[in-house]
Amino acid sequence: MRQEHTATDVAIAAPVSFVLRANVAGAARRMIAIAYLRIAFGVIWSVDAALKWQPAFQANFSQIVAGVAQGQPGFLSWWFAIWQVIVSGRAPIFALLTATTETYLAFALIAGFARKFTYAIGIAYGLFVWSVAEGFGGPYMPGTTTDVGAAIIYSLVFWALFLVDAGRMSVDRLIAARVPAWRRISG
């Protein structure tokens, strides 16, 4: 026996269609919000990069690295001593690498270029800055430390973007349309 559809069947189906459209619209808004977050993060990095290109940063890079070691716990002294030796005599190269890396991160975040690769570089670079230039956020002594450093937060933001970035408003979408293999780099 075949059952006939009644008017109530149609009335029940209509809200489901509405809910699906609402979910799609909500997901699109979420993806656009994530893209705006990525772009705003890129603007923050562009300010940071501009500061790294200043002559004072370039000239004082070695002193900046040496200054971080002051007041750190003894068990970390080897870590900072290694970096002082590495940077010693090579400060202009490291200052240039720092400025270039931050400029790349700013550009790539704003444009949405090679997103997965950029986020991986950002995570690693943030951890590097946190452990060397920020001294793991220390020294951790009562009355002297008020936070754990900014670069660790930058790494967490890069990690979050790595996990949820949807690719809206990005140059990667244009490149991937012409070069499908680009999706491996862009996400």
Q: What residue ranges belong to the model's regions?
A:
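Extended, low-polarity transmembrane helix blocks
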Residues: R2-Y104, A111-G187
